């Protein structure tokens, strides 16, 4: 079927709605939305992909490919109906396949049967044999591109025009692609030269494994790591994991299709003679049965693949906890009264921090206006007057990666980090904690090379006069995003004070972080506790209530792109990924649906694409985590300490998840007091600091005992060999060559070689009269916490800027990731219910 009045091989330049009526959207991706449509002249259904074109797209290539694909007419290839160009949007009209893709199908049904896989492989090979005789390659065979019609016919999609357009438009996108179905010769094309249509045969073998195991081999690996492994000369073709579940014929078919040497790999016509796809009984009825399993699940047994952690006894837990005292005039402790008398600077936002939901100004002077470490900034105690820094502007929510993998609500909420520039260096984010103890303090700062390191360099002996501060812009140049939480405190010129947000919390809290809902703009504090993960909405403090989000013990939390990473315990500790927007949406459901805790079901009971919480593979037994963003490359890494090694993962934007890069087996120090990544110039992966020892060189106050994740051999040196181990409390990289180290009663600012940062006007070493338990870096001071209080000291004067001491209360810092969260309990009863506070009032905190 062709649209009326369509010139041969041309794209119609008129309104496509004269020929097609859009019925409903059936999918969306990076390059546009896909709609179910109806031809207004014939009533026949079609699939219409609408793509927004931009200047620079190679339109002549698109026209050429449309001409080529128009010639392809085969029962196993999705038919091309026509194209339209209207208002800078390209409409591509194709045959509609009502059954959907095999990927969507197996997410619901579980693995296909062996006969169903054989039928799909036969039909796929028939379509490929036709394409190959026409001198064409598909290049993207996988479950997501194999469709079923309502009658069980198998159709190859995303061939030709769609694939070529995708490749053309991808030039303007930061998208690597998914290499898991890629043949070795394609992965190594730059090294070994070209490839031919036999790469499609390899993809058929990988797809056969995908249909039987619900994912292709190496799917848990980061794509770049998978590409690297496939391009190596010693790469071994994958096999079906279960030797007993599948027949020897199926195993042999996969082995033949996955012949590593393309010269020995069979053609599509040759592979069609294999017993696996030539056996009798491979009819459309097999696909119809599969579709019935999707459409009528009650008539079929549920697929389950539970592991040891999936079902656990239901503990008696209060899923909703209300603050016991909401009376503002209630009796306050001595420390709470003093909280109101002290003001604090905003927390320092590190150059090495990447978490930035609300965005930063593109004004190159914006950083300097915040920076206390440039000459001309005010010094002195916290009560001195200082202009309130301009609020952060809202960041546009745009996506630069395929969205087909995400629910609609997740797509809408994705936030793209601003690109790196010379005027504002990239940032690193990090946080660390341990299951056995509360979290170590987190610092945060704005960094563009103008922070502590700039101050140190400008104030060294013999340095030139510091440059003048640029003109401060009017605050209206930086419109404040609307965030529903504790309001800023405009009368507090310095910033803010600690405010109580919850009375009488019965939970044993291990860690805390914060998150802003991208749609409602409500700000939440998220707590990791012995009884699970709980949230507190700061916009509803008048009826403060903590709601359980996840029922398992949690010792570490981190939020990235509306995804909550947690270290939670089932039978053992493991990393989890939680879709925050979907979890909050699920909690809103009325009646029984809201009480069905989907995370208690095995992963395979729920369709995988709709899973709200997923386990991170290869992280069982993880007991410590840290996250870092390399400011030189922009890559984000998560490192986990296992019982006998380290696992390194990298954040992959298109799939919005951390994926495995490397696994190292070796004994870690015990106890593991330090576990922090340090970014080193010109190194692809960070170094992992696992201990601190006394410096052995001249002027070296500390030595970082590190593991080099970049080396395949000799990457591990004996920790502490011939050196004195130090009992470090906290290590964090503030800037590229600036590390804060907390030891006993001292805070030291050192470089990556462990030497003090020299400065005439800044203290590179601060001492306190108590053993520090945790620290938070403020803009020009350090806030150190101890059992019965806290004390702030200025980097510039080494004077006490704030101090609270209350022997009747025991204090503990729960987290300082964007929002500083503090807990206190009565000294006489350390197991009593706790009060919770946040450092509130800074306009830039929300």
Curated annotation (Swiss-Prot):
Domain Protein kinase: 20-277
Single biological process term from Gene Ontology: intracellular signal transduction
Keyword tags: ATP-binding, Cytoplasm, Kinase, Nucleotide-binding, Phosphoprotein, Serine/threonine-protein kinase, Transferase
Region of interest called Disordered, as start-end residue ranges on this chain: 323-485
GO molecular function: ATP binding; MAP kinase kinase kinase kinase activity; protein kinase activity; protein serine kinase activity; protein serine/threonine kinase activity
Residues annotated as domain CNH: 506-819
Coiled coil spans: none
Residues recorded as bearing Phosphoserine in the entry: 335, 433
EC numbers: 2.7.11.1
Known catalytic reactions: L-seryl-[protein] + ATP = O-phospho-L-seryl-[protein] + ADP + H(+); L-threonyl-[protein] + ATP = O-phospho-L-threonyl-[protein] + ADP + H(+)
Highest taxon listed in the record's lineage: Eukaryota
Necessary cofactors: Mg(2+)
PANTHER family assigned to the protein according to its UniProt record, in alphabetical order: MITOGEN-ACTIVATED PROTEIN KINASE KINASE KINASE KINASE 5 (PTHR48012:SF19), STERILE20-LIKE KINASE, ISOFORM B-RELATED (PTHR48012)
Subunit (UniProt): Interacts with both SH3 domains of the adapter proteins CRK and CRKL.
Family to which this protein belongs: Belongs to the protein kinase superfamily. STE Ser/Thr protein kinase family. STE20 subfamily.
Functional description taken from the UniProt entry: May play a role in the response to environmental stress. Appears to act upstream of the JUN N-terminal pathway.
The protein's name in its UniProt record: Mitogen-activated protein kinase kinase kinase kinase 5
